[in-house]
Amino acid sequence: MSKHVHIQLPDGQIQEYPKGITIKEAAGSISSSLQKKAAAGQVNGKLVDLSFKLEEDAELSIVTLDSQEGLQVLRHTTAHVLAQAVKRLYGEVSLGVGPVILDGFYYDMKLGKSLASGDLEAIEKEMKNIINENLEIKRIEVSYEEAEELFAQKDERLKLEILKDIPRGEDITLYQQGEFVDLCRGPHLPSTGMIKAFKLTRVSGAYWRGDSKNEVLQRVYGVAFQKKKDLDAHLHMLEEAAKRDHRKLGKQLGLFMFSEEAPGMPFYLPKGQIVRNELERFSRELQTNAGYDEVRTPFMMNQRLWEQSGHWDHYRDNMYFSEVDDTRFAMKPMNCPGHMLIFKNSLYSYRDLPIRMAEFGQVHRHEYSGALNGMLRVRTFCQDDAHIFVREDQIESEIKEAIRLIDEVYRTFGFEYSVELSTRPEDSLGDDSLWEASERALARVLEELGLSYEINEGDGAFYGPKIDFHIKDALKRSHQCATIQLDFQMPEKFDLTYINELNEKVRPVVIHRAVFGSIDRFFGILIEHYGGAFPVWLAPIQVQIIPVSHVHLDYCRKVQAELKQAGIRAGIDERNEKLGYKIRESQVQKIPYVLVLGDHEEQENAVNVRRFGHQQNEHVPFQTFKDKLVKQVENRGM
């Protein structure tokens, strides 16, 4: 038997090592600097600890702290340090789970006292002590019974509950650092001293295991990075995000509200409705030019429709129901089935296709109260859904046109975006060959358009693969909005047909398409992206006119009337307040243009223009200002 293993590195080189060499030792053989930066290893695609021993031939890559995978390991270990610090400080603590999330981590726990934000400083101090102790982190494999006995002795009832979900007979992995032991799959850093930059950010409540029937635990959130400068940059971003929080700005700018009478369901105030109307108008213009017909379907439809479509199996736990005339109806969680019924209502020839059907459809999906987040996570929202019914030979050309439409929308708002191709999920419908052909078709379209994309394994819709578009906002946060989905299943379920050139009935293919996704969510994203300072074409009030004194009101009203006639949303601040106060108020409301009008402006039929975010005022003829503004609005300029 060979005493060596052959290990293939990422560059294709094959190295021979003694059997049983650890990942850390292998990294050191490549370079000492790589060993210092190493956080974990990836053996045949699986993340493992640096202490993992190579006992057979394998592919190996070293995961460094500056990689995304390395940061996840760092953050996971920091979550364990958090839990250890809390147990040291507060004694009787029952630990839940402590996963890695985007940019950070959290740990759920049951304490004898309620934590407040003021407690975070003390916890951070103890975490730094643990880091300075540079405790070795050991992976320990135990039997189910040994793990059960250990956590029973420690009175860790939540860990015991997690254990119950693991089949008896399976090996259990624990991680130990000093006196602290946790149930965990890992991997982790080799020692606590490798953590250099972290910050606890907030405390909140969370249902144990996300179930509202369970007790509420305390959740402590934190962030961690390889370097302090990265942490500082992230904390600065969080400060900016707090300033741009759409919930705060929505209230400040009078855009929307929520009420306990309809939890998770937004009320649009007049100014907010203006913005929403502009978004819909923009979309309608583009869709009309692209050959879409707009339709409207009922909010509530028979339960059997959702069973027929397949949505019942995937959405029933999140649907709202009502009984009418002894028949059970459901508020629609999706617009798709209604569009299938509309298509089925008419007879189509192959010459009629594609049929492009669009709707601003209001849908309802129940979310747990703890998951609600302003406009970003609601229980009812408007989806800009379209369904394109095509022949098979039209699939790729129609997807290309849908992508071009999405690109035009996002460029108008100044969004960069990335693309994902999401493949077959476990709960999918249909045969393998159809899925493979569909995935190849979507990939071919993206490649022909020169769009780079990532594969998102297993995240397709249950009826077909999809292309997802992730926009980046001003703070470089990613939001998945637009989607294009290919569907061979729905036409089968609804027995949809058209007449082909041989006078035979054949199935169309359906392309599902959304650009904004949820208009309500997109609105919330826009508020944060622009910090509430909308482009002039979207702004609820585009021009605020302020008289120097009441004697200038007539001229102000004349200017307002002409602007309104030109389609500009213009207001006048006629309040009996000081000029400086009125100007500051218009800045707080983030109005794009403020016109301060006095004797000089009236005599010359001019305006004194203050643009939001600009230091310099400009004195220009009124007609020049109006013409320039009208053109800016028409072009939907930034």
UniProtKB/Swiss-Prot annotation:
GO cellular component: cytoplasm
Catalytic activity entry: tRNA(Thr) + L-threonine + ATP = L-threonyl-tRNA(Thr) + AMP + diphosphate + H(+)
Keyword Ligase in annotation: yes
Superkingdom per UniProt: Bacteria
Positions contributing to Zn(2+) binding: C336, H387, H512
SMART domains hit by this protein: tRNA_SAD (SM00863)
Main location group: cytoplasm
Region (Catalytic): 245-535
Enzyme class: ligase
Ranges for domain TGS: 1-64
Cofactor binding notes: Binds 1 zinc ion per subunit.
GO biological process: threonyl-tRNA aminoacylation
Stored Pfam families: HGTP_anticodon, TGS, tRNA-synt_2b, tRNA_SAD
Subcellular location: Cytoplasm
NCBIfam families to which the protein is assigned, alphabetical: thrS (TIGR00418)
Protein family membership: Belongs to the class-II aminoacyl-tRNA synthetase family.
Xref: PANTHER family: THREONINE--TRNA LIGASE, CHLOROPLASTIC_MITOCHONDRIAL 2 (PTHR11451:SF44), THREONINE-TRNA LIGASE (PTHR11451)
UniProt subunit comment: Homodimer.
Protein name: Threonine--tRNA ligase 2
Organism expressing this protein natively: Bacillus subtilis (strain 168)
Upper taxonomic lineage: Bacteria, Bacillati, Bacillota, Bacilli, Bacillales
